[in-house]
Regions:
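A short pre-motif secondary-structure segment
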Residues: 87-90
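Short catalytic/binding micro-motifs of nucleotide second-messenger systems
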Residues: 80-85, 111-125
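Conserved nucleotide-binding and Mg2+-coordinating catalytic segments in signaling enzymes
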Residues: 15-35, 50-64, 69-72
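Hydrophobic framework residues that shape the active-site pocket
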Residues: 55, 74, 96, 128
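Active-site-proximal alpha-helical element of nucleotidyl cyclase-like catalytic domains
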Residues: 66-85
Length: 169
């Protein structure tokens, strides 16, 4: 009986873990992101927003399998960059996020630098924005809004410098 309960518990836990994973990238998914933001929000010291540049162009010119490969490659870059207290998520499409718990500003800066370095080793690029709580606890909605704004500003600079029309990308 004890073995049956242990096996049942293991299978239930395994199924629950699958519901939190993005099957393409292996990162946690959007559902897990919002659940984790609600779980001990006072421990969240920074949020990082990431968005792949040019995914639509890859999908249109090389096919969706190539786009999936690009997303998986970027996800591996993000996973390599993560350290203790940092969790990576695929929010959907070409959008990603990282929650940093009990990480200093310096650790968050180092995370973003590692991401930029790892992505630079690939043929792809992404726009990154982040927001740190600082000394005083802040609402996660504010952190998310600020990191998204920073990421979208970087994305706009990417499109301006590349001369590409972001509406087609």
């Amino acid at each position: 009986m004890t073995l049956a309960i242990a096996l049942f518990t293991y299978y239930v836990f395994s199924i629950l873990q699958l519901t939190r994973k993005d099957l393409l990238t292996g990162l946690l998914n959007r559902q897990a992101f919002y659940a984790d933001i609600r779980n001990n929000p006072e421990d969240i010291t920074a949020l990082v927003s990431l968005d792949m540049n040019g995914l639509k162009a890859i999908n249109d010119s090389e096919g969706h399998a190539a786009g999936d490969e690009a997303l998986s490659t970027l996800a591996l870059c993000f996973m390599r960059a993560l350290r203790r207290g940092q969790s990576g998520y695929r929010i959907g499409g070409d959008e990603f996020a990282i929650i940093c718990r009990r990480c200093s500003r310096e650790e968050t800066d180092q995370l973003v630098e590692r991401i930029r370095n790892y992505v630079a080793e690939t043929p792809y690029s992404c726009s990154v924005g982040y927001s740190c709580a600082g000394e005083e606890p802040r609402e996660t909605d504010d952190l998310l809004r600020e990191s998204d704004a920073m990421m979208y500003a970087e994305k706009a600079r990417y499109y301006e410098s590349s001369g590409r029309d972001r509406r087609k990308d």
